[in-house]
Every structure is written in structure tokens, then in C-alpha cells.
Amino acid sequence: MFEKNTKPLICTTVKGDNADGFIAKMAELREQGTDAFLLRLEYLLPENRTEETFRKIVAGAQGYPTYATDYRRFDKYANEDDECKAEALLAAARAGVDLLDVPGNMFTNETFELTHDPIAVAKQRKLIDEIHALGKKVLMSTHVDWYLTQQEVLDIAQAQQERGADVLKIVTMSNTAKELTDNLETTRVLNETMTSSILFLSSGDMCRLHRMAGPYLGCCMWLATFEAGRKDQPLLSDLKPMLEKFENC
């Protein structure tokens, strides 16, 4: 799962403030045809961010592949430092989550999500090694709210790969037709250049085609949502039948 050169998965976001909320939503999404779950652990109430809770959530996934985040920037409680978040990722790995998201700026206060601070990079490498020792995989993520050139994307991906990431996630912008077509080409080049799996996405006014076509050019998954009104992520209930029709036409 999430391997390079294997069939891409439809991975759908799941949120909740407790295990029961996650489990109920996963049951709905299984009925709609998801292949995997993106577990947004940062939405859990602080008292529910425990290995016991994570085990309940993983059990509720019923064997479907799981990918988990604990993003500081989306944590509305904002009461955990990165050392705590590292412990949460390790607890999630012990609980059985398959793929853990390590942000590229973890262990720093930097806003750009790829630090080159040597102390922080050493901590990231150590965390990645610890997750690997538990038999799990690591995705390293870098999100920006501007357009990145192909060379900038390749440089970020190379740094993520050198730190030990199994999946290289980079999110840029597609606000014009030129940016969109550049990003499609960059997806192909990334897949041909990197040995790790890739998840290269964009947001912005013209991002939808990149999101939809990326897995046909090498991305390891489609990201879907259950929340209507998002331009950057399609509803699972729309995406699943559309892909089936496209692949059978």
C-alpha cells in the first residue's frame, strides 16, 4: 500500500473529536467505496490523543490502509509542541497506522515546511527511523501557498527522500493554465526521478485537474473528502463513480 508503481488508492479524510466519530465516518466511507483512510488526528480532543484511542480507530478501519496526520497548523487546541506530536505519531504507529505524516518543518518554528536546520533535521531523521523500526512508513509533507518551479519541487523532494521518507508529499499552487500544465509535467518528472513514492498536489483556482490526473502520472493516491464545497479535494461520492466511468469508457 502506498508503494511506488502500484495501483493508486482513493484515500478519504476522516475527522472527529473522539474514536466513535472516526469509526462512524469510516463506516459511511466504506459504503461509498473508499480504498483507504486519512486520519486527521489533530481534530481529536486532547484527552483522546492516546494510543488506546488510536487502536480503537485503527480497529474501526477494518483492515483498510491508514495514513495519519497530526498537523500543528490545524490543531485548534494548539497545546502540543512538536515533541508531543512526535510521541503521538509513534503511538499511532504502535497502534497500527500504516503511514505517518512528518511535516518538513517539524521541530522548528519555521513557517516554510522544509527546514534545513541541522538539529531539527537530525530529530526528523531519528523520528523517521523510529517509525520504520515499528514496521511503518513515513510521508514527509511540505505545503506552500505559492507556485513552485519544477526545480524547486525536485529540490524539496530530494531533501525529503534523503531524510528517509517513503512518500514525498508536496503541495503547491495551480492558479493559471501555465502553472497547471507545469505541475502536470513536474508530476511525471518527479515520478521518474525519485525512488520514493510521490504525492504531488496543488491547490488554487485551477487545481482540480492536477488533483484528478496526478495518480495517472505517478502519484500514489487520490485524496478525497466527505465535506462538500472544497475545490482542492473532490467528494468521495463524486470521485469514485467518475473514476469508474473514466476507466471503463
What does each of the following model-derived ranges do?
Residues 104-249:
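Catalytic alpha/beta core domains of metabolic enzymes, predominantly
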Residues 2-133, 137-139, 145-150:
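Active-site beta->alpha loop and helix N-cap motifs at the rims of alpha/beta catalytic domains
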